[in-house]
């Protein structure tokens, strides 16, 4: 009988037929190969459409560079904000598998509409030479398609990484160790898709046409759907645990109702379900922590709670695990906030890096011209280089000195990436200083491009990619690991909203800088003609903000308390 029990997972996961998940038939890498294939194709579709979006808006939709930059940042921000919707639905009602399955329909609808708007006569802008004129209706269709995609990705992005991690049982030490590698390879395949998008698809868009250039990503998304459903029999599914927002609100209400109640010194007197498992479906019990103690009042039993045989209302009395869920989320918020500036730095690859690249010599040999947006390929190559190097070389090397099983703690890993991101902005700033000096020396103010090769941008892209491997992958693992079991989609979405706010911060900074520096008839830092501007000042601003952000992060990380679990999930 003991052997029979050992073949099933102990984290409460089920198979697609709603039976306890068999370790030998479900989960681990045999399930993750389908999830990784899905993510690779979905990211190819996303980046195949988004990488060159600023050029599409500027050249096809005839938008001015500042307007195009803000539109891309706002849309990108929305793509990383909508995951809150998908995460709530996944954790509360559908579970991760069925949430992904539902939202891919919206995603494909948006991709299809965008492809049609770029290829069907009457819906495409009228062009005369290199100048295009989009009508209000054509612009509206384009943005409806884009925001359908943003909604669709909201149900996929917060669920797919958590769904992959669900395939490894935390109670099994061997599987738990493999989960850390999963996040590295998950980010690796994201960048395989991004590499194809930023090279092949951008070239198609600039040299063949936008119809084909957006049609191929749509087909890639369809292939992602096939990959996802093909693995259904191998997946382990976590049961949705009910609305986490309701549970957190119950703790707040109950603790406020008992604001005058004294918390017992003996924490064992706080209310908790007496069973081995948590009363929250899909969640293990959480140990009590001695921080944010005001919320412990929600778990203090009073005479009114014990009156009558009926179970006390959850709006009056909450379990310790329920209280600790709220505490865990609050503890994550300061770490989350420090990711906003990093995300703002990352977002420059799709906006001002491209605008800077447009002013440089894009020729590679006499006959081939590389699109400026394709330089993001070097960010991707950097990630593809550093992800396996980190997993296979850096972790074993660091483990010898730190004694930590992962080489670095998750917070140390994130911090290293924050430092590297500062140098990426310094690199971009140095290049812009050199570019402007060349313009001034040779009086090239009215030239669209100058004879400086675009490959001088490679270091700044490469540094951003290196920073991603440390910070973004570290955040993926950190927010999954530190999230309460029944709130993992929500906390994964929370990490993504930092990217959303980073994009919105970028929009705010561009708007503020443009308004202030263009006053009095001046060209401004981000001028219509960058040769007359000072884009280098914008990069110094971001480098300074990143440095201050890192100092704040160090203080926050020093005081962070990691969560502790007990028991098994229902």
Swiss-Prot record:
What do the Gene Ontology cellular component annotations say?
A: plasma membrane
Record family assignment: Belongs to the major facilitator superfamily. Proton-dependent oligopeptide transporter (POT/PTR) (TC 2.A.17) family.
Its membrane topology is listed as: Multi-pass membrane protein
Q: Which SUPFAM superfamilies match?
A: MFS general substrate transporter
Q: What is this protein called?
A: Protein NRT1/ PTR FAMILY 8.2
| Localization annotation | Cell membrane
Q: What happens when the gene is disrupted?
A: No visible phenotype.
Organism, per UniProt?
Arabidopsis thaliana
UniProt-listed Gene3D superfamilies = MFS general substrate transporter like domains (1.20.1250.20)
One of its GO biological process terms is:
protein transport
Q: What would be one Pfam family of this protein?
A: PTR2
- Membrane-spanning parts: 100-120, 136-156, 182-202, 210-230, 335-355, 370-390, 414-434, 454-474, 493-513, 537-557
């Amino acid at each position: 009988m003991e052997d029979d029990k050992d073949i099933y997972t102990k984290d409460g996961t089920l198979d697609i037929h709603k039976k306890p998940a068999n370790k030998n038939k479900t989960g681990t890498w045999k399930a993750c190969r389908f999830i990784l294939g899905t993510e690779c194709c979905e990211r190819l579709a996303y980046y195949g459409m988004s990488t060159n979006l600023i050029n599409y808006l500027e050249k096809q939709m005839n938008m001015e560079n500042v307007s195009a930059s803000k539109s891309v940042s706002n849309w990108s921000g929305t793509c990383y904000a909508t995951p809150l919707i998908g995460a709530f639905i996944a954790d509360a009602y559908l579970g991760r598998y069925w949430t992904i399955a539902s939202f891919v329909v919206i995603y494909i609808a948006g991709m299809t509409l965008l492809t049609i708007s770029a290829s069907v006569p009457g819906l495409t802008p009228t062009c005369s030479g290199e100048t295009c004129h989009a009508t209000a209706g054509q612009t509206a269709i384009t943005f409806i398609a884009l925001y359908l995609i943003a909604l669709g990705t909201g149900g996929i992005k917060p669920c797919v990484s958590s769904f992959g991690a669900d395939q490894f049982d935390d109670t099994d030490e061997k599987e738990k160790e493999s989960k850390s590698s999963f996040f590295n390879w998950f980010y690796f395949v994201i960048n395989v898709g991004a590499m194809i998008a930023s090279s092949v698809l951008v070239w198609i868009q600039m040299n063949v046409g936008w119809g084909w250039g957006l049609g191929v990503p749509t087909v890639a998304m369809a292939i992602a759907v096939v990959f996802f459903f093909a693995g259904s029999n191998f997946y382990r599914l976590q049961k949705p645990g009910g609305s986490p927002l309701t549970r957190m609100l119950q703790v707040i209400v109950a603790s406020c109702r008992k604001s005058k109640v004294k918390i017992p010194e003996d924490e064992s007197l706080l209310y908790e379900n007496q069973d081995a498992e948590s009363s929250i479906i899909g969640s293990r019990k959480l140990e009590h922590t001695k921080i944010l103690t005001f919320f412990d009042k929600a778990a203090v039993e009073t005479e009114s709670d014990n009156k009558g045989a009926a179970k006390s209302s959850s709006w009056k009395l909450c379990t310790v695990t329920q209280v600790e869920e709220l505490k865990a989320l609050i503890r994550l918020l300061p770490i989350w906030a420090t990711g906003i500036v990093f995300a703002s730095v990352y977002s420059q690859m799709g906006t001002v890096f491209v605008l800077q690249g447009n002013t440089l010599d894009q020729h590679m040999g006499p006959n081939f011209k590389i699109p400026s947006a394709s330089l993001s390929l070097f960010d991707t190559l950097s990630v593809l280089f550093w992800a396996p190097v980190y997993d296979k070389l850096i972790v074993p090397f660091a483990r010898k000195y730190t004694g930590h099983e992962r080489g670095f703690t998750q917070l140390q890993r994130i911090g290293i990436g924050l430092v590297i991101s500062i140098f990426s902005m310094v690199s971009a700033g140095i290049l812009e200083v050199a570019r402007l000096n060349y313009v001034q020396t040779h009086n090239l103010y009215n030239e669209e491009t100058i004879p400086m090769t675009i490959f001088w941008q490679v270091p700044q892209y490469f540094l951003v990619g290196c920073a991603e491997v440390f910070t973004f992958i570290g955040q993926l693992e950190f927010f999954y690991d530190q999230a309460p079991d029944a709130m993992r989609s929500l906390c994964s979405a929370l990490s993504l909203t930092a990217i959303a706010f980073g994009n919105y911060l970028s929009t705010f900074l561009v708007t503020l800088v443009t308004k202030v520096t263009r006053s009095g008839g001046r060209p401004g830092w981000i001028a219509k003609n960058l040769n007359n501007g000072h884009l280098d000042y914008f990069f110094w601003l971001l480098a300074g903000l990143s440095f201050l952000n890192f100092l704040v992060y160090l203080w926050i990380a020093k005081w962070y308390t990691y969560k502790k679990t007990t028991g098994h999930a229902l």
